[in-house]
Amino acid sequence: MKLLLISKLARSSRAINTITQYSRVAGELGHKIAVFGEKQLDFPELQFSLDVPAFDIAIFIIYMPSDFPDLPYLASLLDGMPKSRRVIIDCSGRYNETIRVEHDFNHLEKMDGHQGWEWIEAFQSVADRILQPTLTPRRDDVGSFLFHGYDPEGVVHPVASAAEATQHWSRSKKYGVAYVGNNWQRWTQVQRFLEAIGPIHQKLGPIALVGWDWKRRPDWAVQMGIKGADVDPEFLQQLDVETGDAIPFTELPGFLSNARFCPIFQRPLFNELGLVTNRLFETFIADTIPLVMVPEPLAESIYGPAVRPLLPTNDIGSWLQDIIRNPEPYWEAILRVRQHLTLHHSYHQRLTELIAMLGA
């Protein structure tokens, strides 16, 4: 099958790693994947095409309005591919009634100028099939497709046993804790986590936050009165937290492997809707201990029951100290989760699921 993917590309955000992985495995499975548009030199890993009729299905990967192409490219897509062969993967839960969780919304009218009904009508006008990366869509006219996946070949330091993993992990690392992700609807969770580890942060080692807008609250958020990009620079300074700009997706596994621990946070909205992101899968290929800071039902639905030791306890500081004292059982959990991800969530498995779904 020939699939044409439509989305705005960025090397440090959104679905770039997922799109690249689909492109990699497509040829191995006898399929063809290209990204709609003219060749972009920043993305040598990808094939591009404007020849819409040459493809069987057009798949729109949507986070925000800019993921839809501008005219005349959008017109070319709509004219060149029948609506029955156009699919939307709604990565942010836009195709729902308006939902608010803490400061997080699925319809950010102040930012993108579109109300909830506009999103719903736009999706319905573009495609006959709408998918969301959740096991529990809220609308009857939405299909479940997790989209993101796990790359077992990308594991930074493959090991044969938990004992071997423990020995390698116990060597000196640059960071005690590192989190890679942009400061958008995550500060509440990050702040609680840092407050919990504050008393032992010197024992853990340096802490790093990497992504957009961790140094200070951005001017646009202040001007628009939007709470989702809050941050407390003085608090970060008290813990000697190192902040850095977003990094390309190709550098992510190596960077995370420089840390003992890497928490996995998601937007409150995503936790509420059960939406998954690529970070839930990518973190498990790094040479680090993932701290799975998402709701237990969501975690077990993706990782299986083996993930339980990697879920937070009520006393996060004591939990991390126990891992440091006796890391081998936790590495045993990581290896079992990796096996589960390889079996159920590899990109080969994911693309096979998608092809079967589209061919139905």
Kindly give the residue locations of the regions a language model identified.
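A charged, aromatic-enriched C-terminal amphipathic alpha-helix characteristic of glycosyltransferases
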Residues: 324-358
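Nucleotide-sugar donor-binding catalytic core of glycosyltransferases
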Residues: 2-29, 35-46, 62-76, 91-93, ...
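Conserved acidic donor-binding segment of nucleotide-sugar-dependent glycosyltransferases
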Residues: 306-314, 322-327
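Short acidic/histidine-rich motifs immediately flanking catalytic phosphotransfer sites
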Residues: 50-59, 259-260
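A general structural motif
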Residues: 1, 30, 54-57, 83-84, ...
